[in-house]
Each structure stands twice: as structure tokens, then as C-alpha cells.
Regions:
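A structural signal for small-residue-enriched, beta-sheet-centric alpha/beta enzyme cores
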Residues: 1-91, 95, 101-409
Length: 409
């Protein structure tokens, strides 16, 4: 399937506007945007997936209630405070939804809140009471609106994350756009990671939810920075239907094409998140092929990108392939490692370091050149089947410890 990258992020699909403002949630950052608002022209089919952490943010509890009917029209996101483990958290999130509803003239139940930031900090309504009307007044269906919203949700991210692609459904041009944040507390089973998708494809609520839950296991659940699963992981999608394609109401060719488009944009966003891991100097992608089954392929690729020993080796530009084999070896499951082959690759070239689970002659100098690049691909051929999977991670650096040691200061 062909995709074309387009500008505009979440405002690229028809029917969406966005804004970002500073409202004072980040009291020690006088100018930094800390509140994002996304609004649809029409009531949208909507779906979400959330953290697996038993401690979850108050906004997630509100989202789950508001999404029971499968529809939404606005998303409100704040950074600087997670609204987690706060006595008044749910009530405050509901009050924020009411303020958005009042500002946009929509039901409060059609508003989905999300928060990211420090866990366990008190939260008050005052900044939201100022910021929500300001964000509503600033809403724009332009690329700048998406950029401002993407900027407002950042915490320790070093750059904004947004992307959009176009594709065809039944002769109609459809668009999917995304923004996201997250560079720490990122581990499989969603990550401290917020992601918001918009699309103008017409998809029923039931099929939209199914599509999202089909895409997440092979993308967002395959991403890791530090093995910490956040309390606030949130991925929400709204579908306006304004592209004019026949509504996808069953699992047919159009549904498969839509899932493929979602997968493409999710893979791009995962690479953006992992490559911007706290203190990271390298994006590590592990691509497993010829695994005995999909479960094993996913588990092995996750093990490699989660290995602190291998992550540290990449930081040191050390082609220590034994650490890759070690990570594969402790992966749960019943599979053989006898035919495992490993390559390290980047735009500087490729080195074949392991053949049939044993050393393959290579140049350490060439390997160091490969590992000097930002984007590193680890190719693992298990030689035992036809299944494949990817996972995304980053190297482990001194700065990761420094950033997290200073997080609240």
C-alpha cells in the first residue's frame, strides 16, 4: 500500500483543529506551553488504549467512562502534572471536561482528558480555568495548531513528535495524523507515552477500536526506553469520517488498508519516541525474522532493545554481539537458538557478527563506524520459521541518570 507523508500533523485530516498554550501548570516555566486542546468539527468515532499499570491516572478513569458510547469530539492534555494519586483527581478531570464543553459548546462527556508529568503532586483547577478558554480561542486547523499542541504535551522530550500520511480508500483520499510525547518511563505494554491520532476516514466505533487494538501490540507495546511502565499511558484516536469513504463497518479490504496505514504511522511514531529516549544518542531498532511464531518474534526483539548491557554497549559503540545472544537466550518461550544469525546495520554499512549462534569474523573498526550513526538496526534471523517482528529502543547513557536524578528540580 502506498502512503504519502504530508504536513499538518493532527490537523492534516479534514475536520480537526488544535492549539497549545501556557496556563501555569508548570509554575517554574513561565513561557512553556503546558496545555493542548484538540477539537473536531463533528462528533467522532473514538477509541483509546491505556496503561497496564495498576496505578493509573485520574484522566484515564474519566476517559474510559466517556468512551463507553464510542464517540468523542475533543481532547484536553496537560503536561507538568500527571493527576495521578491525587485525592481530587477524578473530580478535577471531570471539571476540566465541563470547562472544555462550555468553551466549545459540546457535551462534557464528549471530552477526553489526558495528563503527563510528576506523579503524586496536588493539582488545582485555576490554571485550567485560565487555559481552556485561551486554548479554545486559539484553535486553528493549520500545521501550527498541531505543532503548538505537540509542543504543549512535552515533558523531558527534546523535540516535538508529529506526523501525518495520506492513503486511498475506495477512491477517496484519507489522512491520518498523530502527535505524541514520551522519552522516559517507556516500556512495553504502552509507555509514558501519550499519543493522539486523528483521521478523516469513516470508521465505525467498533471497527476503530478493533483496528487500534490490532496495531498496538506490534508497535507501541514493542517500544522500550527504560522498562518503567507509566501510570498515564494513553493512545486515543478520533475519526471524523469527512474524507467521504464508505464507512468501514466490517473487516474487509478497506479495514485491512486502514489498519496498514495505522501501523505505518505507529511505527514511525515509535521510532520517534525511542530515538528521543532520555539522554539517548542512538535509536535501536531490532528486526527479528524467521522466528517460529509471532509471539516469539515479538518477545525476542523486545528482549534485545530492553537489554541494559546491550544498550550500554551501543552507547560505547562496542559491537558486543554476545549481549544480543544473551538477551535472546533469556527470552521466555520454547525455541532454538542454534541457527540465530545477527547483523548490525546503519547508513554507514553493515557487519555480520554472529552465524548459527557463534562468532562470525568481522572488522571491529567497521563495526565502530556502523555504531557511530544515530539509527542502529539489529537484524536477528532465527532460522526456524516465518514470523517476524520489530521493537524500538535506545542506548543507555550517563545523561539518563542525570535527567531522572534532576526530574523534580
Amino acid at each position: 500500500m502506498q502512503y504519502q507523508e504530508v504536513a499538518g500533523g493532527i490537523c492534516a485530516p479534514k475536520g480537526f483543529a488544535a492549539a497549545g498554550v501556557h496556563c501555569g501548570i508548570r509554575a517554574n516555566h513561565n513561557e512553556k506551553y503546558d496545555l493542548a486542546l484538540i477539537k473536531a468539527e463533528v462528533r467522532c468515532a473514538a477509541a483509546g488504549v491505556y496503561t497496564t499499570n495498576k496505578v493509573c491516572g485520574a484522566p484515564i478513569k474519566v476517559d474510559r467512562a466517556h468512551l463507553k458510547d464510542g464517540y468523542a469530539q475533543a481532547i484536553l492534555v496537560n503536561s507538568g502534572n500527571a493527576n495521578t494519586c491525587a485525592a481530587n483527581g477524578v473530580a478535577l478531570a471531570e471539571e476540566c471536561c465541563a470547562l472544555v464543553g462550555e468553551a466549545l459548546h459540546i457535551p462534557a462527556e464528549d471530552v477526553l482528558p489526558a495528563s503527563t508529568g510528576v506523579i503524586g503532586q496536588p493539582m488545582v483547577i485555576d490554571p485550567f480555568a485560565r487555559g481552556i478558554p485561551a486554548a479554545a480561542a486559539k484553535l486553528t486547523a493549520t500545521a501550527q495548531g498541531s505543532t503548538d499542541a505537540a509542543t504543549a504535551i512535552m515533558t523531558t522530550d527534546t523535540h516535538k513528535k508529529e506526523y501525518a500520511i495520506q492513503f486511498e480508500l475506495d477512491g477517496k483520499t484519507c489522512t491520518v495524523g498523530a502527535i505524541g510525547k514520551g522519552s522516559g518511563m517507556i516500556a512495553p505494554n504502552m509507555a509514558t507515552m501519550l499519543a493522539f491520532y486523528t483521521t478523516d476516514a469513516a470508521v465505525s466505533p467498533a471497527l476503530l477500536e478493533k483496528a487500534l487494538k490490532t496495531v498496538v501490540p506490534g508497535t507501541y507495546n514493542q517500544m522500550s526506553v527504560d522498562l518503567d511502565t507509566s501510570t498515564n499511558d494513553t493512545l486515543i484516536i478520533m475519526a471524523s469520517g469527512l474524507a467521504g469513504n464508505p464507512e468501514i463497518c466490517e473487516e474487509n479490504a478497506d479495514y485491512d488498508a486502514f489498519v496498514a496505514a495505522l501501523t505505518a504511522i505507529a511505527e514511525h511514531m515509535c521510532a520517534e519516541h525511542a530515538g528521543d529516549g532520555e539522554g539517548a544518542t542512538h535509536l535501536i531498532t531490532c528486526e527479528v525474522t524467521h522466528a517460529p511464531d509471532l509471539k516469539t518474534a515479538r518477545a525476542v526483539s523486545r528482549s534485545v532493545v530492553c537489554s541494559n548491557l546491550f544498550k550500554a554497549a551501543v552507547f560505547g559503540r562496542d559491537a558486543n554481539w554476545g549481549r544480543i545472544l544473551c538477551a535472546i537466550g533469556y527470552t521466555p518461550g520454547d525455541f532454538s537458538i542454534d541457527k540465530v544469525c545477527v547483523w548490525l546495520s546503519s547508513k554507514a554499512g553493515e557487519v555480520y557478527v554472529c552465524e548459527n549462534a557463534a562468532y562470525h569474523p568481522y572488522s571491529e573498526d567497521e563495526a565502530a563506524k556502523v555504531l557511530a550513526e544515530h539509527d542502529i538496526l539489529v537484524k536477528v534471523d532465527m532460522g526456524t520459521g516465518e514470523a517476524s517482528a520489530k521493537a524500538w529502543g535506545c542506548d543507555l547513557t550517563y545523561d539518563y541518570v542525570k535527567i531522572n536524578g534532576d526530574y523534580r528540580t
